[in-house]
């Protein structure tokens, strides 16, 4: 596992960097998705409470018989009531509406894409009857660029009306939404704060992609090398998100971080866990099954943070990897830990 491929996509005059890397070594209320499972025995006007017994049971279930002591993660705080995880498995279509090459979200027109997503959700619910699967639209709201732009930041922020479109689509199918950010040569916190009005909604969550964070790589052009984000940068955003949760009386925010190499997040052990957040480390490398499982083992299983995610590529895991099909749901459910967030690109 010693090679990495970085693909830069030129789409509509923009450089859109996709997470197409070879592996190495909205308006539906999100609390309705999680709280129905998380909250037990309360009257209509009662203050929500967390079903900690069910939470513990599901966390042990996700550990999948691990005897190493890594999973479930020790000393993690219980989430605030209304938490989506581990009461639900998130099944997400990822992409950008300006590109049909960055992921499933954008690859097909809405009328074709939505039924495909819901079919994947149903198949996941059928494959794992213990944890309900729910749909998500995971939108790349800030994309890394191959040119510096007017401010020299090598990133492009999508117009708000694009995100409004995604929120409207999500409302139609009771899906949650992720805003995903590739910062280029910008700083992480201000790029996240740019979308505060959306992150203040209960059904909108955050994803960040260290692959295209270039400040820790000498400020080189995104796509030339794999980028990096430190735990300190991640924690700064975590503190900000936790503040939004408290200020707006929201259920916990999911905070998803892409990872397929050690250097993308060199110090995951220092990521701070908070009741207001649910941290998902998403293994998003592509390739044949043995390569993907190895990457998952090294950077997810052996370096636990809180929750685990797994990305599947409709094209890169098959045509570009010499495989007839992607890894099956049964194969993924056999991993330790079981991934609770599934992303399709």
Which residues make up each language-model segment?
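Aromatic-lined carbohydrate-recognition surfaces of secreted/lumenal glycan-active proteins
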Residues: 183-188, 246-264
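Alpha/beta catalytic barrel-like cores
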Residues: 20-156, 273-277, 291-299, 303-345
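Substrate-binding surface in catalytic domains of secreted glycosidases
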Residues: 210-250
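Bacterial N-terminal signal peptides that target proteins for export
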Residues: 1-7
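Substrate-binding cleft of extracellular glycoside hydrolase catalytic domains
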Residues: 123-125, 132-211
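Active-site beta-loop-alpha junctions enriched in small/polar residues
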Residues: 96-98, 140-144, 182-184, 211-213, ...
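C-terminal motif of bacterial Sec signal peptides marking the signal peptidase cleavage site
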Residues: 15-18
